[in-house]
Amino acid sequence: DALNLYRIQKGKGSYTGIVACADIQDYLEGKIKKHENTLAAKEQQQMHLMISRNAVVKPVLLTYPEVPEITSLIITFIEEHEAFYSVRFEKSGELHTFWEIRDGALIQRLEDLFRERVSATYIADGHHRCSTTGLMYQRLSPQSPEGNCGLFPAAESTIPGRKLWPNARR
């Protein structure tokens, strides 16, 4: 088992989070919060893509209220370990960097902190992927209820030039 840490840097700004799996039950039970309604046509489009690819190829971006101990563990790990992968996108000027946590005790500590201190996460990007996955789960009862997502502290999830909580589809 492993967790990946993920940092996106652009200019002088950056945001860092955890790439992990989330249980679709958390979405269905409202522990993964949505802030906008979805469009049936886009859900249908997402469903066709998921079925044809047999996968969701883009992770969902979730935010959570910052927990200082989680932030401290992430920062310490990054400072003490080399990244296993880094790629710069010239067109956007973004540098994407990944670290892998394989220390079982650290993974367990992070999981415990999320369980104890993060009562809900919030969808920043991926409402249609979440709603479509939920619909497919309810209709098809897949064997694996988990999907990839990126978890970022809300304080770090402000993307320049983009509102984090648009209500365009309410």
What residues fall within each predicted segment?
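Surface-exposed, charge/polar-rich loops and edge strands
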Residues: 1-170
